[in-house]
């Protein structure tokens, strides 16, 4: 009989079972792939091991077991539209997997282990299991007969690519076999491979891929020298089997999440609301895990996919009638369910909560306007009809409605969207953006990059221990072309830069936030100034050079020397960045994630995830803590160690960085519990002791995106330089005001007080100049019938004074229309006042509308006081005549 296990128990049981049979447990990788730029998100267990598929001998372990976080929402693998409406679609899911790298005879053993796990460990009824194999894979069919005792009726041969996996047009490939669970005849559907296979009765619960071939070209396939096996089982699907349910949303995890949603929204998960609850529960998982792995909501890339997911859920919350943000209140319930295994959820809880609340608040401000437009444009559409793609694009462009959100809203009314029109609008917008971008590379440059990728050479970096070294010039590149030499006599007056690549170098190539070294390369024939060093493809150091004298030839032997003072400042700022990172985590919390950094010669910039601005007091506390670590003069130690060991010891790794099995770990200081104060994986250069940094000073803190703060700071001699400049500035100020440094503030306070008094007096003076009495009116007004018109042009007046003067004048004097034009910096403001006793005939706001029709601009107001703002125009010269005509009619 099948044993009931909750989802956490299944995950643990799976991992422990395969560990018992020689598998190394590898933690789930980040959802942001570090080794595959073609993927938005990790969508399968094999992704983090792709390099081992290509080169199995590089894997430290021959067998691995994982539970991998996956997201399918965007690009080729996009389940977003179906989520909530089917039994098994998710944006976020967990993939159980076990893998073999380079074992020649693991096939039978893997099949036996998987069958035993399902039938003997989980006690799944084997009579409910059937398998599929690729139609020519007789070996696997034979093994299923011997291992599981399956007869041919339960071994289904499939001819389609569903049962043959490949990495691409060329590369590793092989047949796969799938295990299906029969949910019984109460569920409609036929066997895999039949026309009714999509009915749902038979659900795939495990896929086993045997990578035993290599596709060389379209027609040639050969045996792989080293075979691999990739298996995957959806955790949610396994849970349905063990918990006796058919629908993934009925397993314990989702039942608990949906119960929380019911509690907060006060709406039961029945009828149409059931779809909403399922969407919210699924998208909550995806949003929280993406944020925990460093993705921030934005308008492009991964951040936009996250925003789409969040807004789709938030719209469902709105549809349930919730007026206030709700999604962030569900985070604690999710952490209660999944936070013990995925500790990053607990660490990033504050950030996840803040971003969900902030996004929902922002979205609510535009949601009602967008829904109003959508309702207006679709009110006459009937079931089966189509909304214009232009309207869908306007909703996207103006109100932040992702396409699939509009699609989701209309789905309930069986209305579709003209996707072709939407895509055309999107394409036109992208083309306009491209036309504004002036940095496109030439075809020649593109060809160079392609050739570099094909022929790149790894540069041996010797700069950790040496400041000088000999090297052989292996490439010279100028004007996007390979050249044999660079000659000072053939260089034009601009002395164009060129690229120089050597077999080894002491020059650090820009990476990990640290900018590249500068220095000199020379031999008996030439002297070259290195203005920068970059690193391509993760291993090729490219020196950006200008020739000073002589001629440099390909294959020449050169002496290379970095600028030691420049390197020292880079080391100082890099080590200071590590200490700053540790201080931020210590004082603000472990939710802090590094989002970017720049380590320069004269300053550092550090971007981190943090929900709110950092107060001045906290910045002072952080700065003091960094300086305290510096003054302790503790050792900065380098350790070369296995990646897993470094992570186990608490090393901080960047989410999007790709690490090898061996890593450089930089430790700084120790805490009372014998842990390092700072412990990070880092390929940069550092000081030997924190005292070498000297001092640290934060210059600024600001927001650069939702939930991302930027800190700029200086260290070392630059702190001393700034302190000296500040002191000299104080001396100048004290001298200017004939006071001591100690009394500068009281002097400034006195000046501010005096300035405020003078401002007040000036305002009163200008007000007195504008306020008019009956006698003034008689002398300066134009009489238009019984109406008196006062018309004035002024410059550089505070508009508040003008409004007050016009309002008070028209209140005190009857039958008056007062018009004042204030001109400031090519902009004009027109203030119009009308006496209350004539507003039955003339209204200030109506005069404004008529004037705007003539001169442009915008404005409004009341019957007695109104205002127009516009760019200065020559039409203003005739404005008095226009107003006279309006008053005369």
UniProtKB/Swiss-Prot annotation:
Its cofactor is Zn(2+). The keyword Zinc applies. It is found in: Cytoplasm. One of its GO terms (cellular component) is cytosol. SUPFAM superfamilies: Class II aaRS and biotin synthetases, Putative anticodon-binding domain of alanyl-tRNA synthetase (AlaRS), ThrRS/AlaRS common domain, Translation proteins. Binds 1 zinc ion per subunit. Its EC number is 6.1.1.7. This is Alanine--tRNA ligase.
């Amino acid at each position: 009989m099948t044993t009931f296990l909750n989802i956490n128990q299944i995950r643990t049981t799976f991992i422990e079972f395969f560990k018992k049979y020689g598998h190394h447990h590898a933690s789930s990788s980040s959802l942001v792939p570090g080794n595959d730029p073609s993927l938005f998100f990790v969508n399968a267990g094999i992704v983090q091991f792709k390099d081992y598929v290509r080169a199995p001998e590089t894997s430290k372990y021959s067998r691995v077991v994982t539970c991998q976080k996956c997201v399918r929402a965007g690009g080729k693998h996009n389940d977003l539209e179906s989520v909530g409406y089917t039994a098994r679609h998710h944006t976020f899911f967990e993939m159980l997997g076990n893998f073999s790298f380079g074992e020649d005879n693991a096939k039978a053993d893997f099949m036996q282990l998987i069958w035993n796990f399902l039938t003997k460990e989980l006690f799944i009824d084997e009579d409910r299991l059937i398998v599929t194999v690729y139609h020519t894979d007789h070996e696997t069919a034979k093994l299923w007969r011997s291992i599981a005792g399956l007869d041919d009726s339960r071994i289904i041969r499939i001819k389609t690519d569903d049962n043959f996996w490949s990495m691409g047009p060329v590369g590793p490939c092989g047949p796969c076999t799938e295990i299906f669970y029969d949910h019984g005849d109460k569920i409609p559907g036929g066997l895999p491979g039949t026309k009714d296979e999509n009915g749902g009765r038979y659900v795939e619960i495990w896929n086993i891929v045997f990578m035993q071939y290599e596709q060389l070209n379209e027609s040639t396939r050969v045996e792989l020298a080293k075979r691999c096996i990739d298996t995957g089982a959806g955790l949610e699907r396994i849970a349905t089997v063990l918990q006796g349910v058919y629908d993934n949303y009925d397993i314990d995890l989702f039942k608990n999440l949906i119960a929380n949603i019911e509690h907060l929204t006060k709406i039961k998960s029945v009828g149409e609301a059931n779809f909403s609850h399922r969407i919210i529960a699924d998208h909550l998982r995806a949003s929280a895990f993406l944020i925990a792995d460093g993705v921030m909501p934005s308008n492009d890339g991964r951040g936009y996919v996250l925003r789409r997911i969040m807004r789709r859920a938030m719209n469902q919350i709105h549809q349930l009638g919730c007026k206030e943000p709700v999604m962030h209140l569900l985070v604690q319930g999710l952490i209660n369910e999944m936070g013990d295994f995925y500790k990053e959820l607990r660490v990033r809880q504050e950030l996840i909560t803040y971003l969900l609340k902030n996004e929902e608040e922002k979205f609510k401000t535009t949601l009602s306007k967008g829904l109003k437009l959508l309702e207006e444009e679709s009110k006459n559409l009937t079931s089966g009809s189509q909304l214009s793609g232009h309207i869908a694009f306007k909703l996207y462009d103006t109100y932040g409605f992702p396409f699939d959100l509009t699609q989701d809203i209309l789905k309930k009314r069986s209305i579709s969207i003209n996707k072709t029109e939407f895509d055309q609008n999107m394409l036109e917008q992208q083309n306009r953006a491209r036309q504004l971008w002036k940095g496109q590379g030439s075809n020649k440059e593109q060809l160079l990059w392609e050739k570099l990728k094909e022929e790149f050479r790894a540069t041996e970096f010797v700069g950790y221990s040496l400041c000088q070294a000999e090297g052989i010039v292996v490439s010279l590149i100028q004007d996007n072309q390979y050249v044999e030499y660079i000659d000072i006599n053939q260089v034009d007056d601009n002395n164009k830069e060129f690229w120089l690549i050597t077999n080894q170098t002491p020059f650090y190539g820009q990476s990990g936030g640290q900018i590249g070294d500068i220095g000199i390369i020379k031999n008996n024939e030439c002297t070259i100034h290195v203005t920068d060093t970059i690193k391509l493809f993760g291993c090729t150091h490219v020196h950006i050079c200008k020739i000073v004298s002589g001629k440099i030839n390909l294959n020449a032997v050169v002496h290379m020397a970095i600028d030691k003072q420049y390197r020292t400042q880079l080391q100082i700022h890099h080590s200071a960045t590590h200490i700053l990172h540790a201080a931020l985590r210590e004082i603000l919390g472990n939710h802090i994630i590094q989002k970017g950094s720049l380590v320069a010669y004269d300053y550092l910039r550090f971007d981190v995830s943090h929900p709110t601005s950092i107060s001045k007091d906290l910045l002072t506390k952080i700065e003091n803590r960094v300086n305290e670590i510096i003054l302790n003069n503790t050792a900065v130690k380098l350790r070369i160690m296995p990646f897993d060991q470094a992570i186990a010891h608490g090393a901080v790794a960047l989410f999007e960085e790709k690490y090898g099995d061996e890593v450089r770990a930089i430790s700084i200081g120790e805490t009372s519990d014998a842990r390092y104060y700072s412990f990070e994986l880092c390929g940069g250069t550092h000081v030997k002791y924190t005292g070498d940094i000297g001092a640290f000073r934060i210059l600024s803190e600001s927001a650069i995106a939702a939930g991302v703060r930027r800190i700029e700071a200086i260290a070392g001699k630059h702190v001393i330089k700034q302190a000296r400049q500040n002191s000299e500035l104080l001396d100048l100020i004290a001298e200017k005001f004939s006071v001591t440094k100690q009394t500068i503030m009281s002097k400034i306070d006195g000046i501010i007080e005096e300035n405020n008094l003078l401002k007040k007096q000036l305002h009163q003076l200008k007000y007195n100049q504008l306020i008019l009495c009956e006698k003034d009116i008689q002398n300066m007004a134009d009489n238009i019938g019984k109406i008196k018109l006062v018309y004035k042009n002024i410059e550089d007046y505070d508009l508040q004074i003008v409004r007050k003067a016009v309002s008070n004048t028209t209140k005190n004097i009857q039958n008056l229309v007062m018009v004042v034009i204030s001109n400031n910096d090519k902009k004009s403001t027109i203030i119009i006042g009308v006496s209350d006793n004539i507003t039955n005939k003339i209204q200030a706001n109506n005069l404004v509308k008529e004037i705007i029709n003539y001169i442009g601009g915008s404005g409004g107001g009341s019957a007695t006081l109104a205002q127009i703002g516009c760019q200065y125009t020559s039409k203003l010269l005739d404005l008095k005549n226009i107003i006279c005509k309006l008053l005369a009619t």
